[in-house]
Amino acid sequence: MFRRLITMCAALSVLAAAGIAAKEKTVMVGGAAMYPWKDIIDNAMNSKDHTTLVAAVKAAGLVATLKGRGPFTVFAPTNAAFDKLPKGTVDMLLQPAHLDMLKGVLTYHVVPGRLDSKMPKEWAHKGKATTELKTVSGDALWVAMKDGKLWLKDGKGMTASITIPDVYQSNGVIHVIDTVVMAK
């Protein structure tokens, strides 16, 4: 009897996990599958489009944080987004002397909680054209819906397009963006 109960519990656990995995589909980013049961770092490390971001997260000592429980919403700039920065900026940020600046840039791309693309659509229906988000760095970042597409506006007034929304992770969600956003 006890053995049957254990077997039934195990089967229910497998079914529950399958239901969660089915709800949060696997998305391809940078030529790699982003599995919803893996954490933000484990998935990002597999994306060939996010090698600069991963190197920056490692240099800033933020790997353990982003492997933590979260949940986190990460607006993940691609390598091409980092390439848009003035020449030498990335190399300068990766130097130990600029660690605090690097952490500030990276934590500006992270919002506590798990915010998916449905939220701005819901806010838009409530008459909000733009919604302010409080980032981990403590600065404001704005999200807006324009022509059916999600956009970020940073503290300097620059915009970034969310090119791949809702890449679910075990500890949050990633939204791929085409521009590095900056606080004031």
Question: Where is each model-derived feature located?
Answer:
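Mature, structured domains of secreted/extracytosolic soluble proteins
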Residues: 20-184
